Swiss-Prot record:
Localization (cell): Nucleus
Region (Disordered): 1-21
GO cellular component: nucleus
Originating species: Talaromyces stipitatus (strain ATCC 10500 / CBS 375.48 / QM 6759 / NRRL 1006)
GO MF assignments: DNA binding; DNA-binding transcription factor activity, RNA polymerase II-specific; zinc ion binding
Residue ranges flagged as DNA-binding region: 25-52
Keywords assigned by UniProt, alphabetized: DNA-binding, Metal-binding, Nucleus, Transcription, Transcription regulation, Zinc
Name recorded for this polypeptide: Tropolone cluster transcription factor tropK
Signal peptide location: none
PROSITE patterns, per database record: ZN2_CY6_FUNGAL_1 (PS00463), ZN2_CY6_FUNGAL_2 (PS50048)
GO biological process: DNA-templated transcription
Function noted in UniProt: Transcription factor that regulates the expression of the gene cluster that mediates the biosynthesis tropolone class of fungal maleic anhydrides, including stipitaldehydic, stipitatonic and stipitatic acids.
Biased composition (Polar residues): 7-20
């Protein structure tokens, strides 16, 4: 005889706390956890980062008698089969559930890796990009090697980003973008990023940051297109407004989108975005941020430093794009903008007064410069060298060459002084260098400046007897510089390709051009060219600038 046992039920406020029968999802049933039946995902599924599935066919009739369970083996097999059909490959060991809000800078991105397109409603495809992005009518002969997003459903633009996703995206940006584009003051950003009263410009910057961050992640490609569309929409909105002085966040968003367009779209689109960015910088008059007359001394140093960094990043983009396309510079007024401070001073809000670019080039400053500031100095020297090349092309056949060789010698002396300073700073360094991508890029661009100067004097055929020594010295120095770049390429191969400076392919292509035009210099030329070519292929997986140099 079976014994009937009356089950007791706990009540709170007159209502039963027992979970409604049949309401638990498959994940909670499988883990034997209490399910709160929230939509679209219960709390347990949200924390585990898995899809919350409820099966209408899965129901268990609970017997009123504890000692009366019919067919236990059959029921267990049925339950296992149903769970296996829904999630045949789920492995709990793949997910890290130990997320701590206090250790923000040590978090991982496992939660975002489990976001699927099915988590969002279906969107109708956009017919075209925002109006400021030009339509591409010219066929591109370069294959797109980046991960394609066609056919992947994007989240709706008004879909809220929860706190966990928000923090993961911010951390991804700091890990993979901020060190290469150090224009953002982190404390200032975190002071407003969660504010419900943030401005449209701040929202635009936020989405621009996430656009670039997701583009450098293999797991988040399905999010980047919607972020990109939202950013472009906000940028178009600001462009249509008649505002006298745009906010600094708007300029920062423009800078990030230029980098995105160059790396993930194509050179023409990046060039067009750069034009908009430069106009914003000029409209804000950032080229005179440190002009003594009329400067607002009450403005805090961090805000001025952010504006300086926005100017110098736009200047760097303008310079590298002009080198790539052999065009004149658009931003030329650098006399009233101090060079960016060291990153540690900037991040810690430590006031310092940096020298001007002209002071550094004249050798009248002994200030310690950041790797980014050093790269600005060497990039400016390269630009002066290319301007001298244009001057040589315009010389008449009968003109004197004395003045030209004096300019070449002057630039060579400036380079020797800057390179000697770098050699002293890195005298204890060995290959491979540290994983600081900006420092590695700075050393590469410093060496490439010697290659640019060598090409300039080589194109000038009217060498006098007094200039033979300069020519021979430059040839030897160019060989050494090319070898240094080849050595650095070995170091870069050991870095994450997501952390390589976007314009590294420009330097590698210049080195490869030097080797190919001087194949009789040494016996290791072919090996060096092959190594650089392999590095370009390595970078081309995430950077379309490298794709253009591979053809």
């Amino acid at each position: 005889m079976s014994v009937a046992i009356k089950m007791s039920t706990n009540t709170v406020g007159g209502q039963s706390t027992r979970q409604p029968p049949g309401s638990a999802c498959l994940h909670c049933r499988n883990k034997k956890m209490k399910c709160d039946a929230l939509q679209p995902r219960c709390k347990n599924c949200f924390n585990a980062g898995v899809e919350c599935i409820r099966s209408n066919n899965y129901s268990r009739k609970r017997s009123a008698q504890r000692d009366h369970i019919e067919g236990p083996q059959d029921r267990v097999e049925t339950s296992d089969a149903e769970v296996y059909d829904v999630q045949p490959k789920f492995n709990p060991g793949l997910f890290n559930l130990d997320f701590h809000m206090d250790s923000f800078y040590d978090m991982d991105y496992n939660f975002l890796e489990n976001i699927t397109p099915e988590s969002f409603p279906i969107l109708s495809p956009l017919d075209s990009l925002p109006s400021l992005i030009p339509s591409e009518t010219v066929e591109c002969s370069q294959p797109q090697t980046v991960i394609e997003t066609a056919g992947i459903l994007a989240p709706p633009l008004n879909d809220p980003i929860n706190d966990l996703m928000h923090e993961d995206l911010d951390q991804l940006y700091l890990d993979r973008v901020h060190r290469l584009i150090p224009i953002l003051h982190r404390r200032r950003y975190f002071s407003w990023t969660r504010s419900p009263n943030r401005t449209d410009a701040q929202t635009c910057l936020q989405f621009a940051m996430w656009t670039l961050a997701t583009s450098l992640s293999t797991q988040l490609q399905h999010l980047r297109e919607s972020f990109y569309q939202r950013t472009c929409s906000l940028l178009d909105k600001f462009t249509a407004q008649d505002t006298a002085a745009p906010q600094i966040e708007y300029a920062q968003a423009c800078i990030l989108i230029v980098n995105y367009d160059l790396m993930k779209e194509n050179f023409r689109r990046g060039w067009t975005s750069a034009g908009r960015c430069i106009r914003v910088i000029q409209l804000m008059r950032l080229f005179e941020i440190d002009r003594s007359k009329g400067r607002n001394d009450r403005e805090d140093w961090i805000q001025r430093e952010e504006k300086r960094r926005a100017f110098w990043m736009a200047y760097s983009l303008d310079l590298f794009i002009s080198l790539r396309g052999e065009w004149p510079l658009s931003l030329t007024g650098t006399d009233f903008v101090r060079l960016p401070a060291l990153d540690k001073d900037f991040d810690n809000s430590h006031y310092v007064e940096m020298p001007f670019l002209g002071t550094v080039l004249s050798g009248a400053s002994s200030s310690v410069l950041s790797p980014w500031a050093e790269s600005i100095v060497f990039a400016t020297i390269i630009r002066r060298i290319t301007a001298l090349t244009s001057e040589l092309e315009g010389l008449s056949p009968g003109s004197s060459s004395t003045n030209v060789w004096s300019k070449i010698d002057l630039l060579r002396n400036i380079l020797k002084s800057r390179l000697a300073s770098l050699s002293f700073k890195h005298q204890d360094s060995h290959f491979p260098f540290s994983d600081d991508p900006m420092e590695t890029f700075m050393i590469m661009i410093a060496q490439s400046s010697v290659l640019y100067l060598y090409n300039t004097q080589k194109s000038f055929s009217r060498a006098t007897e007094s200039s033979q020594n300069i020519s021979m010295a430059l040839q030897y120095e160019a060989q050494m510089a090319a070898q240094e770049i080849a050595n650095l390429s070995t170091s870069i191969l050991h870095m994450s390709r997501f952390k390589i400076h976007p314009f590294t392919p420009l330097i590698l292509a210049k080195c490869m051009e030097f080797y190919k035009s001087n194949q009789n210099l040494d016996e290791i030329t072919q090996a060096a060219v092959k190594q650089i070519y392999e590095l370009l292929r390595h970078i081309s997986k995430v950077n379309n600038i490298a794709v253009e140099y591979l053809s």
